[in-house]
UniProtKB/Swiss-Prot annotation:
Its main location: host cell. Transports viral genome to neighboring plant cells directly through plasmosdesmata, without any budding. The movement protein allows efficient cell to cell propagation, by bypassing the host cell wall barrier. Acts by forming a tubular structure at the host plasmodesmata, enlarging it enough to allow free passage of virion capsids. Keywords: Host cell junction, Transport, Viral movement protein. InterPro entries: MPV. This is Movement protein. Residues 246-279 are annotated as: Disordered. It holds the Pfam family 3A. One of its GO terms (cellular component) is host cell plasmodesma. Transmembrane segments: none annotated. The keyword Transport applies.
Length: 279
């Protein structure tokens, strides 16, 4: 069935056989693997000192070539109205830090077109995140569809660019970026409303939320104290040392604060229980 020109969807613009061919190109095991390894789709990308600038295309180079060939063959015989366009409604990036909040550094994230040698942000859609701002969600919306063409030796498509700045003294991973998007391909294109890049700061996960009640906190402290006493003072098949027991009992008895530097103060410091989880 020849191109009808009545729909923007690829399925209605070409025969069922050719749309099936395109599905095989996009969702073959090899294509899915390439999307993960070359584009980091849905995977965590680590920002390190030796990888301060990351450019990740939204379509693998091999897949890009096959899709472009598919559209070109349909265009040459008159079945398709163009050589193909790539459309990405939205790119969503989840950014988390992997160092303490006092580390001085930032990330600059933006969407670029590989057809641009300068890799400038598309329509100024660029977000800067300081380390203490993280975690955060970042979103981009391209304002046009990208032609499936080759410019010089570059396969033209959209790409996510991440730049790491600062973090002096931190050579390892300082932030993790997980990007998700859904690329679409059609023989017709469009322009879209300009929407500024979105930046939503996210509250860090409170893993102690279930232990905010006093009873839960008391149970946690009691279990920690019991563990310490057991590990230090319970001896198998032996009589408990009287001195050790008396010092153990001091943990549960409130006493006036001792003078700094006194022997009692140093002894209480030595047997002060370790409290976990910031409690």
């Amino acid at each position: 069935m020849a191109f009808q020109g009545t729909s923007r969807t690829l399925t209605q613009q070409s025969s069922a056989a050719t749309s099936d061919d395109l599905q095989k190109i996009l969702f073959s095991p090899e294509a899915i693997k390439k999307m993960a390894t070359e584009c980091d789709l849905g995977r965590h990308h680590w920002m390190r000192a030796d990888n301060a600038i990351s450019v990740r295309p939204l379509v693998p180079e091999v897949t890009h070539g096959r899709i472009a060939s598919f559209f070109k063959s349909g265009y040459d015989v008159g079945e398709l109205c163009s050589k193909g366009y790539m459309s990405v409604p939205q790119v969503l990036c989840a950014v988390t830090r992997t160092v303490s909040t006092d580390a001085e550094g930032s990330l600059r994230i933006y969407l670029a077109d590989l057809g641009d040698k300068e890799l400038s942000p598309i329509d100024g859609q660029c977000v800067s995140l300081h380390n203490h701002d993280l975690p955060a969600l970042v979103s981009f919306q391209p304002t046009y569809d990208c032609p499936m063409e080759t410019v010089g030796n570059r396969k033209r498509c959209f790409a996510v660019v991440i730049e790491r700045h600062g973090y002096i003294g931190y050579t390892g991973t300082t932030a993790s970026v997980c990007s998700n998007w859904q690329a679409r391909f059609s023989s017709k294109n469009n322009n879209y409303t300009h929407i500024a890049a979105g930046k939503t700061l996210v509250l860090p996960f409170n893993r102690l939320a279930e232990q905010t009640k006093p009873s839960a906190v008391a149970r946690l402290l009691k279990s920690q104290l019991n563990n310490i006493e057991s590990s230090q003072y319970v001896l198998t098949n032996a009589k408990i040392n009287q001195n050790a027991r008396s010092e153990s009992e001091e943990l549960n008895v409130e006493s006036p604060p001792a003078a700094i530097g006194s022997s009692s103060a140093s002894r209480s410091e030595a047997f002060r229980p370790q409290v976990v989880n910031g409690l």
